[in-house]
């Protein structure tokens, strides 16, 4: 009997997805380039299950019912293309390849176009949830043609995480939409993790919380509607773990140098390309880079002294303020992520449903959190919401707690504790809420040295000033008795020298 589904790549994620597919009633064939890996899987975790081992791509293809559906779980980039190039000659019209890795969305755009032009189908599917999610139900983000998605819908809706309002999967959009949404998910994840790390740093190094106290604090936070999440849950768990070799808290023995695989950088690069501000994600990526300078930081710590101010306030009150600062910063981080998804949807014609994106992240994935339901509701009430900060509930939350947020960041500055993501989030809020920013000066500078022109607030049009000439004239009329900024009551304002420029951008 032919199998319903095929899978290539038996690392842990591949194995767990294969078991998930089989457990949900879909017979599956598996292939791995290492025969030993395949044999080990079949003889242990897949023993006595409806999982068929194959030892060549030809055998895999022949074992599947048509139209064939084959999930690739290999490293992103060239390995995906290599597997696809070997598979394509073996497939027939209507057969489908699904890439479940963290591929760059532009690669997925290319692969969808190439496959569809030959009568084959291609789905780029983001998979979030790690090893546990892959086995028990991940959040899935499939993109490609809707017709291709409908063919795998019966399978993916079964294997995805299940929450109160349905499976954590939906048709994301055309081309690379699925991998784009997964990329932004990962960017938000970077922000979440950095914000939590900064909260930990403040609690430990400003008010001296022990790991036992940190476990209790994060455990309590995880019971709240605001901060209940997978990442807060595992953070609390981490603080309870003792290293058996030293009888010390394990987290304190881990080198403070965080790695990254690149999806955070991809998110930032895309945001810059689309002109979307994502300062919290950027701060998170930069913090990981700074952490990698371990040897330099150790050397610098012996040379560069920081402030000697010690915190002498109320410890419990500060813990509550850190909680408020963390939540406000988290709202800003998600606002940036959703704004980026909205901009990409318009630019690439993805037609994303932002409320639905929040819904499918409620379960299975790394950023799953209770407050995602609030984001879903916000976009259901107003699908054209310009920014999450403007949603009534989130707006009021920040207005009510911004005093604590600012106090925490001020305390961090006074005590020499870096909080780049907290600070970037507050800067984002303050910049977004201000009707006027100092970039009028920036634009004047650009026009001064590069004739980049400017617009005015008092009349229509695009203008350029001869700034050197204006400076000379201003010097001629100034006197020692009259400051440059002072204008006599009866003095007529001087006319700005302007020319009609060519409209240019830079």
Annotate each predicted stretch with a short phrase.
Residues 221, 225, 346-379:
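Small-residue-rich helix-loop
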Residues 5, 80-83, 98, 104-216, ...:
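Rossmann-fold dinucleotide-binding core
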Residues 1-68, 91-94, 131-134, 487-489, ...:
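NAD(P)+-binding Rossmann beta1-loop-alpha1 motif at the extreme N-terminus of oxidoreductases
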Residues 179, 204, 209, 224-331, ...:
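Interdomain hinge/lid region at the active-site interface
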Residues 399, 404-486:
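C-terminal amphipathic alpha-helical interaction region
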Residues 69-86, 101:
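Glycine/threonine-rich flexible loop motifs
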